[in-house]
UniProtKB/Swiss-Prot annotation:
Gene3D superfamilies: P-loop containing nucleotide triphosphate hydrolases
Sites where the protein binds ATP: G70, P71, S72, G73, A74, G75, K76, S77
Catalytic class of the enzyme: translocase
Induction pattern: Regulated by RAM1 during arbuscular mycorrhiza (AM) formation after inoculation with Rhizophagus irregularis.
UniProt xrefs under PROSITE patterns: ABC_TRANSPORTER_1 (PS00211), ABC_TRANSPORTER_2 (PS50893)
Protein name: ABC transporter G family member STR2
Amino acid sequence: MRHANGRRGDTTIDIGKPVNFTGGLEFSNLTYTVIKKIKDSDGKWLNQEVDLLHQITGYAPKGCVTAVMGPSGAGKSTFLDGLAGRISSLRGRVSVDGMDMTPSFIKRTSAYIMQDDRLFPMLTVYETLLFAADLRLGPISMTDKRQRVEKLIEQLGLSSARNTYIGDEGTRGVSGGERRRVSIGVDIIHGPSLLFLDEPTSGLDSTSAHSVIDKVHAIARAGSTVILTIHQPSSRIQLLLDHLIILARGQLMYQGSPKDVSLHLGRMGRKVPKGESSIENLIDVIQEYDQSELGVEALAAFALTGMKPPPLGAHEMSIVPPSPAPSHREGRGHDRSNKRLHLKDQDFDHSLRSNWNTSKSWSASHSGVLQTLGFSPARHHRDHRNQNSVSSSLGDYAYTSENFRSIPTPHTQSSECTLNENDFMTPYAAANTNAYQYLGPKFANSFLSETWILMRRNFINIRRTPELFLSRLVVLTVMGIMMATMFMHPKKNLQGITNRLSFFIFTVCLFFFSSNDAVPAFIQERFIFVRETSHNKYRASSYTIAGLITYLPFLAVQAAVYAVIVWFALSLRGPFIYFLIVLYMSLLSTNSFVVFVSSVVPNYILGYAAVIAFTALFFLFCGYFLNSHDMPQYWKWMNYISTMTYPYEGLLMNQFQTSQTFGIDPLGRSITGNGILKSLNISQVESKKWEKVYIMLAWAIVYRILFYIVLRFFSKNQRT
């Protein structure tokens, strides 16, 4: 919707009001190539280029549900990622209503709903959608946001679960179907024009799956271009699909209305058995050809040119049982080991071409088609001159009426969507319009507004999961009492001084280890961050600052409780406020370090391993076992980067910067505090102890900056 001044207005999705739309998403010559390691007949490993997607051209109409289907390993999710801009090396052109898709354009106009519903378990359905509205809808009134959320809850059929927690393995919450609908609601609250869904019915029962697709169908009718991948949809779900794109081995097998699949099969000379789904029958036929000597190239040529593929023999047509068909990728190497290359990684088995696909019985008479479609598994040399880049090859492919007349799957006659041939004949000039200037700001809220919204959400999550904070507090309280009773009344000798040094180093280690439980908590939250920021929901900087500010008061409480317990019980000397600040800075720098490590590792097991390994190193080089002056020159740098060095030395300086006697040596000489520091090569100057605080603060800032850099530049849902 545009106002009179040309600016784009607020687009509200009302899925209860069907509207006819034209236009949509177009794509041409989409190709995605990866380098695979393969083993030749001599057992040697070779690098080979393999196309996971190969020259796919088509469209997804606006106001319709476009379903991407195909056998297992057909490239459905890869194709969806390519359309959604999640593959950086994709070649070809993708455009929406004639406007080329750029990363910035995709983030502002689309939403991508993953298979895994990454949501905060301790927020209710209403709160989850309201926070999404806060972050997506910008500075509109809270009343309008609440009305939008209430309307969306009703439209998604979530009224009965409005005040129910999302839940997880440990907390009972909404059902799987309701959870999936909440995920959809989070991403459509701002009315995206493009909606991508990866297997939205995965893991759901038939009733829940139908409910989800029914809501998605209503969203499409409200004006969005909806593209989803789906595997073996039920007959009820098939009635809700408006447009099909069927793939096999990364090539286009069929495109058009589901109602025209039987016509497509009839033109191939195949009849759909009575009572059987035409879509499932087509997928069975695809698998039969894939297992035959002809391969799926024959069907790809038929989809492109209408050239009827040769019929299969009776023994070849019996390869695939009636649907639902199992994945034919499993165990193929056993039957065809002498004719196939052996992959090092079977995950990409679907991308390799059958070496029967170039059989002389078909390719000799259709060499022109194979030249258009083709590639072979042993293709080591590629002509890159004909490969397109999403950003640079805008005019290499042009839709014409002849192209659409030649496609043997008519869609405009039987599809319920309002389609027009001219909707898919977008000239190259259309991509050069000035429509980009009407996309609006990159983010809906200011930096400060985002930070405040994220802080409120963090506080709610902490308040409803108090065990994380309370567990740390209980540990520090119990350990404080134990330390106070164990090290009370130290003796006035060398052993008493050693005991006091042991108390300080154990305190530092205790505070370091108490932050380790942040590893799984953040790793779980990181997936939500990646989902939310992939489409400009908020800035990585605001997320970093909000997380820091949220934990500051909780860290202060932990430090204060421990400090009060041990300070008075052990009659420690020096300013109490300095003792408290050192403990607080130690917690802050350690927490920042643990959060940074958690942002780098892929899972909490490696996270724990990394944190424990660094803890051991920092402990070894902190100066307790060997002071910095006695360390080998090539290891001194470890003393400087150890986050245990500075709180340990700061606590010692606060305790021993005095001429007071702390013990008597074996020769009967007095041991003063300054003498203890001198023996440890620690400064006896009073003002120097504040440098330790500044250094700890600097390390906390450095680790937070590194944390931000990882989030900003390396935490992206994108393939190379």
